[in-house]
Amino acid sequence: YGYDKYGYDKYGYDKYGYDKYGYDKYGYEKGYDKYGYDKYGYEKYGYDKYGNEKYGYDKYGDDKHGHGKDYEKYGYTKEYSKNYKDYYKKYDKYDYGSRYEKYSYRKDHDKHDHDEHDHHDDHHDHRHHHHEHDHHHHHEHDHKNGKGY
């Protein structure tokens, strides 16, 4: 079959196509594709192509929403440190109105702003977007720009 007594062919590859160092002829390691990811999409350090490991955190300890590992446990994000009550944790996606009221950092926002936020948050698409996407960014957006819409 062309394999020597160690199981390697004349090019130095075993029957699975890997050499003694565990690389195939394209230079990829056993179990990893040419981009360095395994069948589950993680590379050898445990991060997927988005830079997240199997628990959903990247090398900086943030998940895809930008929340650190402490977020789950303590309800704090790295960005806002432990001095702030977490802005989203206690509320589900249908509770934006009271969330905004109770936890607004913009103490000076007027009634008009507040009503606009409530009204806007009732819109299904917006609510979905707000819930699913980057809370950190949205949070800043709301507050930096006042109405923000």
Swiss-Prot record:
Segments of this protein annotated with the region 13 X 5 AA approximate tandem repeats of Y-G-Y-[DE]-K: 1-64
Basic and acidic residues bias: start-end ranges: 105-124
Keywords assigned: Repeat
Protein's recorded name: Putative eggshell protein
Basic residues compositional bias, start-end: 125-141
Disordered as annotated region, ranges: 105-149
Sequence repeat copies, ranges: 1-5, 6-10, 11-15, 16-20, 21-25, 26-30, 31-34, 35-39, 40-44, 45-49, 50-54, 55-59, 60-64
Source organism (scientific name): Schistosoma mansoni
